[in-house]
Amino acid sequence: MKILQVCDKKISGVEYHRLLIPHGKINESEEVEITTAHIIDHLPDSFFHQFDLIVSSSVVSKMGFQEILWKQLKRIGIPVIIDRDDTWVLPHNHPLKKDWVSKKTAQQITYNLQQANAVMVTTEHLANMVSPLNKNVYVIPNAIDFSQDQFKPDLKVKRMKTGHIQIGWSGSVTHHHDLVLLAESFLQLKSDPDTQNKYRLILSGFIEGDAMWKEYENIFTSGYRISQEQYCRINGMDAFTYASAYDMFDIGLIPLKDTPFNRCKSELKMLEMGAKKVSVIVSDEYPYTNIAKNKKNCLAANKKEWFKQIKKLITLPELRSELSENLYNEVKENHNIEKVNELRLELYKEVINASNKV
């Protein structure tokens, strides 16, 4: 089986988890050969004849010539799977909305979803979003490759920890409405006698000079009213190293505001922190409800419970240890890349066989 994966030169977190890492593992098999291309526009038919299947994230044409490229691929008869990890409909306040509209990104993704032989998504909810556009939609959930360096424990980083309980969050510029959920709890932490001076907050993914990240920092420091010893930031890293920040965390915060956009996300952040044996507190919202077992592998919180749950993990080290171990075992046993790749390969074979019968 010869597969062509199409992804950008600069690998995003999405392509890392959905294409590069799964296919790298699959490529270790003697029965599968994976080839990577960054742009497949304007290539001769003979190039595509060597492959049984194309897999691409969101769109096939990275140059924006969707209809032209799809016409060629349909004529050749090579099957195509489009992978999508969240919704293509951005809310009006999304930081990328203006660029999304000017480039007609949503329309391009919609067209690709309609044309594909099959679509891979991360959750059942997202599958329901795609199904009106393409009935051949399959849930291939996110998973962790424990052989990747960033998902191995880094003892050097662990030795750098201070005496404080380290409480961290990691993300991008698109999460302001999620972090607002934590603002009041951070204020309470600094004044509660059972928690003050016992913790340090870590903001991971920081981009110097970005106004949104300064706003994030304002939330984490309660308006710069906590001491320097109780806050630190970790600069943004690439897709191959960002999870190394979790080695600094004792407690991971995963807030998520319930919105139509957020319901299309996956449980990936919880899987990542679980793989690094971090005890986590998650919003009691979909998609985390897929794997979250409150008081067993995490603590769940509604918008009024964040302080209570954070305080609980600061003051109860045995609970931190129990939750982190249980979540690690859940991820290791049920959300490892080898197990999920069995579903992925089964789908690939099914799509190729169906195409050969046409």
Predicted feature locations:
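Conserved donor-binding/catalytic core segment of Leloir-type glycosyltransferases
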Residues: 4, 158-187, 202
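Nucleotide-sugar-dependent
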Residues: 61, 177, 233-275, 281-292
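Membrane-proximal helix-turn-helix segments that form the acceptor-binding/catalytic region
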Residues: 71-75, 99-118
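Acidic anion/phosphate-binding donor-loop and adjacent secondary structure
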Residues: 144-164, 345, 354-355
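Nucleotide-activated donor-binding/catalytic signature segment of Leloir-type glycosyltransferases, i.e.
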Residues: 205, 213-248
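A charged, aromatic-enriched C-terminal amphipathic alpha-helix characteristic of glycosyltransferases
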Residues: 318-352
